[in-house]
Swiss-Prot record:
Substrate binds at H59, L60, R61, N91, H276, A286, G287. Pathway: Pyrimidine metabolism; UMP biosynthesis via de novo pathway; (S)-dihydroorotate from bicarbonate: step 3/3. Belongs to the metallo-dependent hydrolases superfamily. DHOase family. Class I DHOase subfamily. Binds 2 Zn(2+) ions per subunit. This is Dihydroorotase. It catalyses: (S)-dihydroorotate + H2O = N-carbamoyl-L-aspartate + H(+). HAMAP family: PyrC_classI_A. Zn(2+) 2 binds at K135, H164, H204.
């Protein structure tokens, strides 16, 4: 046995003390009894070993916008925040809409990524090529490219589609992007999924009505996510700080409360990490950095009794694996030995000065939180410990399952 992790971890929804054996970067054994190994990592009391957390919505910029973020800086931010896999959004500059650009992106990741990664492909009337997932913007957002025929692009996709659901016509007429823009778009997605029965994932749900539509639809092939900024911030925060401009916008306190009230029914939490420089933000750019703050904010919520560690594992590990069909990840024998180790008792203050993102600011500046990521392990190797990035870029592309079916609690489609 090369490496043995010893400490407290979650198994079958229970927290237990045990041992995890790692060989050749894979989980080789999970046991309550001691495992002998060449190298032991002992996790002290008050700290918990979580399976490696996955963020299915990340904008890493690079290409012509490497001054905002690069694959190197963004994946350093990811592992600093306890994220072991990032899903790379394709609305880059230039956008990833052909095979040549996708291959260029993969080449960059192979050389620069500190985290494992999934590669996205943008659909807006173009021909799809094989990718890990596809992205459709129903209305213009950062990058300005949107699908003029959503249903056609959705049908054309070769695998699951992540959808930015804001109706183009409504946001053209009402640039403040009112709730109806999201609601109308969600209605269209639901109808398309009912008709074509192809997997779809709606990004960053922000409204109570949009959430209700999705929960009532009970479609096996349709999943969705919420972001920490829609869970922790509201329109009144934006009124005080225009840097908090984001699409979809921060909503009312009623909407925020509705997301929390239904948090047990939300399949995925994702950051929608969308970094811009302060200069670009002051000029009106939409998007918030979030890779390094999402897990600490959620750990703090665990300490406050709003959610459980099991909820975090389900929404940032178990469900992303099911929904996006990731073959090589999971907390079981034979899967990659990825772990996010957290100190549930550590109190600290979020400061932009201590973050790896190039954004240079955070919406949560000065927030006092209880709970911190202290170590990140990818394929059995420590890549971050106590805020320090360790070693060179060693990220690998995820392995996708073949035609995967998903079951997130409902087998009905109606």
């Amino acid at each position: 046995m090369e490496v043995v992790l010893e400490g407290k971890f979650l198994l079958d929804k229970r927290t237990i003390e045990g041992y995890i054996g790692i060989e050749d970067g894979k989980i080789s054994k999970i046991s309550l009894r001691e495992i002998k190994g060449d190298h032991k990592i002992k996790v002290d009391k008050g700290k918990v070993i979580l399976p490696g957390l996955i963020d299915v919505h990340v904008h890493l910029r690079d290409f012509e916008e490497s001054y905002k973020e690069s694959i190197e800086s963004g994946t350093k931010a990811a592992v600093h925040g306890g994220i072991t896999v990032v899903f790379d959004m394709p609305n880059t500059k230039p956008p990833i809409m052909d095979e040549k650009t996708l291959k260029l992106r993969e080449h960059l990741f192979k050389r620069k990524s500190y985290a494992d990664y999934a590669l996205g492909f943008l659909l807006a009337g173009n021909k799809p090529v094989e990718a890990d997932f596809y992205k459709i913007f129903m209305g213009a957002s950062t990058g300005g490219i949107y699908s003029k025929n959503f249903e056609e692009d959705y049908i054309r996709a070769l695998d699951i589609v992540s959808i930015h659901a804001e109706d183009y016509e409504i946001i053209q007429k009402y640039p403040e992007r009112p709730p109806i823009a999201e609601i109308r778009a969600i209605e269209r997605v639901i109808e398309a999924v009912k008709t074509h029965k192809k997997p779809a994932h709606i990004c960053h749900i922000s409204t109570a009505k949009g959430l209700k539509l999705l929960l009532d639809s009970r479609l096996e092939m349709l999943s969705f996510e919420v972001t920490p900024h829609h869970l922790f911030l509201t329109r009144s925060d934006y009124d005080k700080n225009p840097l908090l401009k984001v699409y979809p916008p921060l909503r009312s306190e009623e909407d925020r409360i509705a997301l929390w009230k239904n948090i047990d029914k939300v399949p995925v939490i994702a950051s929608d990490h969308a970094p811009h420089t302060l200069e670009d933000k002051e000029a009106g750019a939409a998007g918030l950095p979030g890779l390094e703050t999402e897990v600490p904010l959620l750990l703090d919520a665990v300490n406050k009794g709003l959610i459980t560690l099991q909820d975090i594992v389900e929404k940032m590990h178990i469900n992303p694996i099911k929904i996006f069909g990731i073959e090589n990840k999971g907390f079981e024998k034979g899967k990659d030995a990825d772990f996010t180790i957290v100190d549930m008792k550590r109190e600290w203050t979020i400061r932009a000065d201590n973050l790896y993102t190039k954004a240079g600011w955070t919406p949560y500046e000065g927030w006092r939180v209880k709970g911190k990521v202290i170590m990140t392990i990818i394929r059995g190797e420590v890549v971050m410990e106590e805020d320090e990035i360790i070693g060179k870029p060693r990220g690998e592309r995820i392995v996708k399952k073949g035609k995967h079916r998903r079951n997130l609690g409902s087998s009905e489609e109606h």
